[in-house]
């Protein structure tokens, strides 16, 4: 869990209010996921929850459209990526089942890529660019450890 002192030092750094809200939203979502996983594991929840312990959670936001989307990292299933993201994937060699050169993460598996994809589909604005998307920090739901953006995501989102 994030301690009050570490959160205060983070808040006191020169971070925009919008970015703080986005990061707080990602933390809230991470805690919610972790509690659902614990409830499922211990049989507390009566409703059937198909949630697993995801390795990373992130929130993506386009401040110009006021949309915020949460997502998590997971294996590829029949996910159809937006053409803007696919163009960047193709520049990196396309979606494969192996690792891309220079990065341990597989294309399409990262929380940032999934959140951006969901956001671009919800915006339905073809003029928006990938660089307009802002991301929260990625967190591990169980430990609340902050995860840095991988090389693939840095390339795809020009960060």
What function would you assign to each model-found segment?
Residues 1-159:
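Zinc-dependent deaminase catalytic domain
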């Amino acid at each position: 869990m994030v301690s009050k002192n570490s959160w205060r030092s983070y808040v006191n750094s020169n971070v925009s209010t919008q970015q703080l809200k986005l990061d707080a939203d990602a933390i809230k979502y991470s805690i919610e996921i972790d509690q659902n996983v614990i409830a499922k594991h211990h049989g507390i929840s009566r409703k059937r929850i198909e949630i697993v312990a995801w390795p990373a959670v992130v929130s993506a936001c386009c401040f110009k459209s006021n949309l915020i989307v949460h997502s998590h990292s997971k294996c590829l299933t029949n996910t159809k990526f937006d053409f803007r993201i696919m163009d960047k994937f193709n520049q990196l060699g396309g979606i494969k089942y192996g690792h891309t050169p220079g990065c341990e993460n597989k294309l399409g598996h990262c929380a940032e890529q999934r959140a951006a994809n969901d956001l671009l589909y919800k915006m339905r604005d073809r003029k928006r660019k990938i660089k307009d998307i802002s991301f929260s920090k990625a967190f591990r739901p169980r430990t609340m450890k902050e995860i840095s953006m991988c090389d693939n995501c840095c390339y795809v989102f020009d960060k």
